[in-house]
Amino acid sequence: MTTTTTAADFRHALRVRATSAAVREAVTTEQGVSGWWFPTTAVGVDRLHVRMGDSGLELRVRAEGDDVVWDVLDCPVEPDWVGTRVRFAARPDGEGGTALAFTHHGLAALPCLEVCTAGWSWYLPSLASYAETGAGAPGPRPR
């Protein structure tokens, strides 16, 4: 597992012992995102509403080649996220698993960098666990 930040992006790489199709399902469906991050509701064909406590965020989910991209459309809980993009690049690793390259474009330039880095560093292993076993660690992360 590797985490890096550049001038504008937060990146995290990890190996998932599941197929890239399982990883894709985990980041594109209501059930998938709810299983590793926060309770999620599908809104139309390409949108997800993710509930975080009394607030939440709206995502447009789209494919860009083999990657899945979340465009953050609204985020009252973390307004600086609006306009950022989250990319999940899942590729077969040649050993029956998946190499997942995660990028939150624009995050490193935001005031929430420290808190958000800790959050993604907690939730990405939860995503891997969900894809591997069907059980992640959704909801508020331990402090």
Put a short name on every predicted segment.
Residues 1-42:
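Hydrophobic ligand-binding cavity/cleft-lining segments
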Residues 34-43, 48-101, 105:
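Hydrophobic-ligand binding "helix-grip"
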